[in-house]
Amino acid sequence: MYIKHRKLIATHTPLQLKFHEAMKIHGGRLPWEQLPTTAQAIPAIYKIAQTLISRAKEIYPHLPSIHFDFINSPKINGIACKSNGEYFIGITGGSVTLLQLMVHRMLADPTLFTDIGDPAKEESELPYIKKFVPDAMDLFKTGTKVSMPKNKVRLSYSCNLINWAAIFLVGHEIAHITCGHVDYMASNIGTPYIAELNWSATNAIKPMERQAMEGEADQFSFAGLLAIAFEKSGANSKTSNHAQINDLYRRVFEYSFSANLLFRLLGDERFVG
């Protein structure tokens, strides 16, 4: 999801303009309100992101404001930064598009996730993604299209996996703020942001130091997803029944699968070259 040659419109709120300025070097704000209904994942991710930020504020009540929105870039990336005393978190529209491309293609295949919905409704022979590059615009130029699941249950399940992968990335960026990583980079390196890919400050810190920050952010993000899984399954009660436990197992699988796919998109040579 990317809007080329985007112009700021008068209806942008002051907060949206703040986000745009903070993320300008990364692409600025994606005006997702202008996108077609096919971008339905965006509002859902935005809503859950606000919930995660609210939870972070409950745990760290003295934490300055954190603002989340989407970045107008076709590439996959997540960024946490600090600007004028406020924190900003953004994930690129390209991240959502690439997740849709991969996950929808899986659920559109009748031989995958056969226990979800009615696989017989799906096409038996789908075109393969012949050459994957981590840039939605480049894929679009080569004629690559998103294959959508035809069965409604499978489509809904696919959308959930996409949402959770994106939310894991949001939680990861929140952790970069709450764990002090962004402040550390600002005070020690002079770079007030952390980007998952194409980060200019990568060589400014030791690889082990960067790895430790990323590992800590992953830990906090997944812990947040597990907390949501317990809440939604009802398995956090001493009287949890078999169905609730099974539901918890399923949710943990979904979150783990989604996070793993995101890791692949961010760093597997088979995806990013």
Q: What are these regions, as identified by a protein language model?
A:
Residues A217:
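Histidine- and acidic-residue-rich, metal-dependent catalytic cores
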Residues I174, A186, G190, A201-I205, ...:
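A structural signal for the main folded, soluble domain(s) of proteins
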Residues R154-A166, N203-M213, S240-S256:
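Glycine-rich, flexible loop segments associated with nucleotide phosphate handling
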Residues C179-E214:
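Post-HEXXH active-site segment of zinc metalloproteases
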Residues R210, A223-G273:
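Long, well-structured alpha-helical subdomains associated
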Residues M1-W164, C179:
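Hydrophobic or amphipathic, alpha-helical segments that drive membrane association/targeting
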Residues A166, E173-I189, A223-A229:
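Catalytic Zn2+-binding segment of zinc metalloproteases
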